[in-house]
Amino acid sequence: MSGKPPAIFLMGPTAAGKTDLAIELTTVLPCELISVDSALVYRGMDIGSAKPSKEVLAAHPHRLIDILDPAQSYSAAQFRADALEAMAEITARGKIPLLVGGTMLYYKALIDGLADMPAADATVRAELEAQAEALGLAELHRQLAEVDPESAARIHPNDPQRLIRALEVYRVSGESMTAHRRRQFAESRGADAGAGGHLPYTVASLAIAPTDRHILHQRIALRFSQMLEQGFVDEVRSLRARSDLHAGLPSIRAVGYRQVWDYLDGKLTENEMRERGIIATRQLAKRQFTWLRGWPEVHWLDSLACDNLSRTLKYLGAISILS
């Protein structure tokens, strides 16, 4: 192993069983957990985010859960700063940071650093927002596909915040967001060619998912139905009652929350809300798989295997991450 301290990434699509395996690992390894999930950072968003229960969190604390109010935004840059601080504290106590979650952009921000993007431009942003209002998001997505096809392929056509930001970067700088990120990636590898790039840790990357995609789809549908039974609609209703929350916020645009919000707005029937929530979650899982297919040196585990703990320990021993 290199002179860097170890860290473990436990990644995977939604509903794959990441949290259960992470908790198992903490019982046999000197690990402390850091959540890597853009929805779990929000207080009061428990059911729809599949947040671990209060009992689980009390027994197995996770950093970066319940750190923000839903009215606030949280960026990859903020996550990187918070995660690095938590990792340093954990390492200083002789423990191993175990990062668990499915927000792949956050993992990438940790590994590669963040591209030096142009600052927001209020005039350009107002113009793009006016276009979105007048012409629709599909037109903005078409424009983005012309100047930055890679970002267009990655950004959902109904994600106004990311669409507008990608077009804003291009209009302000004359260079696509993809080009900015490629340059930053090259610089990070040049600055530190070791594992982790800008990240001062030796990272073991694990990913867990069912080998049969149909099984994952069944899990997603079952979990969404269970969320509804547990009071997901009432949870969103309480958020909707707040005057400072609206459908344009990143928290409310989270998968599931957006669909239930639309249902409470009368835009969807209950059946439509359920179906669209499941579809949106499946689409999220597909995007997570896309990220993971390009992830270097990732060790895959089958969610359905009964010996994932021993398989994980064997792998970590084989790459000497624990020595």
From Swiss-Prot:
The record marks T103, R125 as: Interaction with substrate tRNA. It comes from the Bacteria. SUPFAM superfamilies: P-loop containing nucleoside triphosphate hydrolases. The gene is miaA. GO terms for molecular function: ATP binding; tRNA dimethylallyltransferase activity. Monomer. It is an enzyme of class 2 (transferase). This is tRNA dimethylallyltransferase. GO terms for biological process: tRNA modification. Belongs to the IPP transferase family. NCBIfam families: miaA. Its EC number is 2.5.1.75. Catalyzes the transfer of a dimethylallyl group onto the adenine at position 37 in tRNAs that read codons beginning with uridine, leading to the formation of N6-(dimethylallyl)adenosine (i(6)A). The keyword 4Fe-4S does not apply. Pfam families: IPPT. Substrate binds at T14, A15, A16, G17, K18, T19. PANTHER family: TRNA DIMETHYLALLYLTRANSFERASE. It catalyses: adenosine(37) in tRNA + dimethylallyl diphosphate = N(6)-dimethylallyladenosine(37) in tRNA + diphosphate. Residues 37-40, 161-165 are annotated as: Interaction with substrate tRNA.
